[in-house]
Amino acid sequence: MLLIKRYLMDPESLRRQIMNVYKCYMWKRAFHSNRSLLEVKRREKSLQRKILERILRPKEENAVKKSGFKLWSSHLNNPHKTYMRLEELQRRIMEEVHVEGIKKNDKLFNEINQWHFQNENTSTVRTPTLLIHGYAASSMSFFRNYPGLSKHIRNLYSIDMPASGLSSVPSLEINTTTPLPLDIKFIGENKFKVPYTINANHNKFVIQMYEDFYLDRIEQWRIDNKLGKMNVVGHSFGGYLSFKYAVKYPNSVNKLCLVSPLGVERNIWSVNNNFHSNTLYTIDFKNPNSKFYSKRNMIPKYLFEQQFHILRMMGPLGAKLCWNYIMAAYSRVPSLAYKEYIFELFYGKGGIPEVTTDIFKALFSRCILAKDPLMDSLQYLNVKKLLIVYGQYDWMNKKAGMFMVKELNNLKNCLEGASYLEIPSSGHNLFLDNPESFNQSIVSFLSDETKSP
């Protein structure tokens, strides 16, 4: 009561006290808001920073330490030795993969290394289904998924893409003149202009030739296996190629599943933009549906050009850093043989052939944005059904996937519609991080069984 009387006698003192309480409240609110914002920013770290952290600070739990010198000295060999190691490691990995039905490995016409899982006792997914791996990977990427998927898919196929894994390395032939490339001049923090216009049709024609290195061989593989329409499930760069394959060969694809696909976003590097020369444009760093979109971070030119070759140039240190990265990036994968397989791909001489990196550099900018984005070709896609799926903690731009699904459903060129999904407790390699949830989602999407109302 005395305190109340005091404030009644001195209203200015009461006002100051109320203001102090309000300021304290606002400070606490700002603190918690900033802490939440920092947490969001922490989760949205750039790809470059994530890679650097994995190289320098690999997780200790379940990590197998190896000497950089021993790793380096054991890889002073020719590509044939790398191939033999990959072959042996594939054998070790697949020995631990137990499936219902038949598990068969072939090198079709001595070109495409394929795995075929046949289970005549299931009728859930009767349409043949092909798994397509991402960049610098192989059919071994899905080794944790083969048992669960083949239990419900009658004929499941997985291949090493051309110039990947144990598949042969065809020569790359681009029989045309090199087009004048898109040149972007950045001005300040958020402006850009192009000093000259490009021949968009010529650029797109050349991009198509690079893509056809893969697309035409996938189609020939389908014909050689005497398959009709098939389901296609593609991850990352494999998702990008799966989409382009469905556009070029619409009569070959039934359902299409894009797993954390690369190259979805519209962006300033797209050859489809038709920018005017010497006109100042503003970059949109937030909206992946805008042709003015770009990322803030760009891979240094030398690193982008050299890629995995840099690791070998660094000697024992490069070998050690490569192993550290693999231990961190695949910490949730228990198989040591798989990690050794990935090391052989990344570090082994000829593990990632030059033709593979050349094509990737021709199709993507140093921001890892496509020069012919998927969003620019949605009107040409005609499949029965589409699913785009990401990991909960995926570094890919999930907002772009949401835009893609929305636009496809507006266009109505997917007979049964397009849908978006996230796999919990997983990142970009969601099928490795959470195989059970991934398998269940894929089987549900691909199912040929009629669902009761």
Swiss-Prot record:
Top EC category: transferase
GO molecular function: carboxylic ester hydrolase activity; lysophosphatidic acid acyltransferase activity; phospholipase A2 activity
Presence of keyword Transferase: yes
InterPro entries for the chain: AB_hydrolase_1, AB_hydrolase_fold
Primary localization: mitochondrion
Renumbered ranges of motif HXXXXD motif: 428-433
Pfam families, A to Z: Abhydrolase_1
Keywords: Acyltransferase, Cell wall biogenesis/degradation, Mitochondrion, Transferase
Biological process terms in GO annotation: cardiolipin acyl-chain remodeling; cell wall organization; lipid homeostasis; phosphatidic acid biosynthetic process
Compartments, as annotated in UniProt: Mitochondrion
Residue span, AB hydrolase-1 domain: 130-435
EC assignment: 2.3.1.-
Annotated Gene Ontology cellular component terms: mitochondrial inner membrane; mitochondrion
Source organism, top-level taxon: Eukaryota
Domain notes: The HXXXXD motif is essential for acyltransferase activity.
Note: Present with 143 molecules/cell in log phase SD medium.
Task of the protein: May be involved in cell wall organization and biogenesis.
Family recorded in the similarity comment: Belongs to the peptidase S33 family. ABHD4/ABHD5 subfamily.
Protein name (Swiss-Prot/TrEMBL): Protein ECM18
Organism, scientific name: Saccharomyces cerevisiae (strain ATCC 204508 / S288c) (Baker's yeast)
Lineage, broadest ranks: Eukaryota, Fungi, Dikarya, Ascomycota, Saccharomycotina
